[in-house]
Amino acid sequence: MKRTFQPSNLVRKRRHGFRARMATKAGRKILNARRARGRKSLSA
């Protein structure tokens, strides 16, 4: 059977990248939460 995780850097960036996060209000909320928490990496 086909595995569920088929890695693709392009899809990864488009779906979870910084620009994708900044594009929506909810995404900006995620980034702010990760900043507040002191995450080293904010997004993919």
Curated annotation (Swiss-Prot):
Designated gene of the protein: rpmH
InterPro entries (UniProt xref): Ribosomal_bL34, Ribosomal_bL34_CS
Lineage: Bacteria, Pseudomonadati, Pseudomonadota, Alphaproteobacteria, Rhodobacterales
Annotated GO MF terms: structural constituent of ribosome
Family designation: Belongs to the bacterial ribosomal protein bL34 family.
Gene Ontology terms: cellular component: ribonucleoprotein complex; ribosome
Descriptive protein name: Large ribosomal subunit protein bL34
Domain of life: Bacteria
BP-aspect Gene Ontology terms: translation
Pfam families with a match to the protein in the record: Ribosomal_L34
Keywords: Ribonucleoprotein, Ribosomal protein
Organism name: Dinoroseobacter shibae (strain DSM 16493 / NCIMB 14021 / DFL 12)
The keyword Signal belongs to this UniProt entry's keyword annotation: no
